[in-house]
Structures are given as C-alpha cells and as structure tokens.
Amino acid sequence: MQGSGVALVAVLLSVVGCSTPDIRPSDAVFDELMRKSGLWIQLAQVEPMMQAGVSQAQARTTALTEEDLAHLQEAIASAYAADALRTTVRDQLVATLPAQDAAAVLRWLSSDLGQRITALEAAGLSPDAATKRSDAGPRLLASLPASRREKVERLAKATFSADAAAAIIVDTMIGVSRGLTFGRTGVPVERVEDLKSKFQSQKDRFVEVLEPRIVADFASIYQPLSDQELDQYVAFCESSAGHEFALTSLDALDKALTEAATRLGQRLADVSAMQGGALPPALRVVAARAG
C-alpha cells in the first residue's frame, strides 16, 4: 500500500475501551507493517533526493565552496539517514495508531490482494516505471470509463497521496534552504517552524499541482486490477482503519522530516565549531535548542 512518492501511508496503535488494558504490538510488528506498506523503502529515498536538491541548487548558484559543499553533503547523509527516519516514523506510529487498526492493516497487506497490490506499487517505484507513467499515465486516465476514473480519484484522496508528496517536497526544500546557508557569513539560519510557515502557501499549491499527476499515476499503477479488486482496495482505504493508517503515517512522515531538518542544522553547527569558527547567532540558537 503506497500512495505517494507518489504514495505513502503506514500505521498503528492504542486500544479503545473503558477498562480494556492498553496492549501494544511489538516494534517488529511495526517494522513488518512499514515494509509491507512500502514506507520502509520510500524513507530510504529521502536522503538521495535531498542530495540531488542540493546539487541542483549548487549548480545554479555556486553558493558554497567545495569544502563546505562536502561538509553539507556529509551532514545530509547523517541527518536524513534511512534508519533515523524509520525510527522516528515507527515511534510515532507506535504512539498514535490504535492496535486494532494496526491489526486490520496488517491483515489487509498480508491478504492475496494486498500482496498483489504491494507488488504493483513496488514495481512502480523504479525510475524506468516512473518515466513511462509520466507519459502513458495521463493518456490512460483520459481513456478510462467515468466509473473507473472515479475509483482511482477516490483512492488518491483516501491515501492523502498528494499531501504526502507535497510534505516531502516542502520538508526537502526546508532542509536544502537551511543547509545552503552554511558557511555564508551574516546569513541567518531560519528556524524550521518559521520556514514551515513561509512554505505553507507553496505546499498548498504543490497539493493542487500533484493531485492530477498522482491520479494519472494511480491509473497506470493499478491498471492490472479488475474493477472489483480496485473497489475492495478503495473500500479498505476509506475504512476507519485505512483512514487512520493514512493520517497517522502522514503525520509520522512530517515529524520525521522536520526532525531531520533540525538535525541538519545541528550537524552544520557542529562542523562550524570543529573548524574553530564563530557560529552565527541563528546557528547558536539551533545548537542550544538541540541541547
């Protein structure tokens, strides 16, 4: 179950009931859920995307010296390490998703149809597949009967895929923005919260732009499914468990990327300190907050 990246969602925990004890699944259950949902792999793609963003920005502006660029790339590799992102997401899921929803999602992902869908989504993650979809997806979507198109649109909406993709883009922009101020004398490093506020209008715009693209992607990715199978998938995503699954994983993703952007600022402050340079005031604030 994907839904972003063109698709992202994941899950779990906290039992409901007046006198029912709070029983929580083990971390192994959450790891299995993240793997089967595709989130495990998707989180490993964030750091390379960050590095690509910095390289593109550097090529346009040459804002950093070669030495500073190398330090920035090392800091990104550390701050956005896949294992660190996975740990944050898993911990957030453990703390916020009801156990019965975790069980329901895992049952779905483990079913024959759930496994088929996961395989389709995994195949769609390759660069070649994405390139083909960008061309064929819109044409396929335009050729679909209205009833099939409506199912695909409902699926994209139920999985919050455009929101998740926009969150990744904005949080990546925040990380790049903070990172590129490294080594630039007199240029303050803005707080993550301030940057989030500044980029919010762009995030809303990204959602608008990404939604039709994701619907076209979904038309292509899920083309092998029959109408009945697609109906079952949409019904699951729109169910109480599926809805919580999507919302909780979106919040967990945002938390993981926000923490990574903060870690990036801290890593760069550490590098400046090791080089014996005086930290800019804003970086001193970041370092103090980290402590």
Language-model segment annotations:
Residues 1-7:
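Bacterial N-terminal signal peptides that target proteins for export
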Residues 7-15:
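Bacterial N-terminal signal peptides
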Residues 22-129, 264, 278-290:
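N-terminal Sec/ER secretory leader and immediately downstream segment
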Residues 32, 36-43, 73-80, 89-93, ...:
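Second-shell loop/turn segments in exported
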Residues 120, 125-133, 137-140, 144-145, ...:
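Outer-membrane beta-barrel domain signature
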Residues 125-223:
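Extended amphipathic alpha-helical interaction segments
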Residues 196, 204-291:
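A cross-kingdom marker for long, charged
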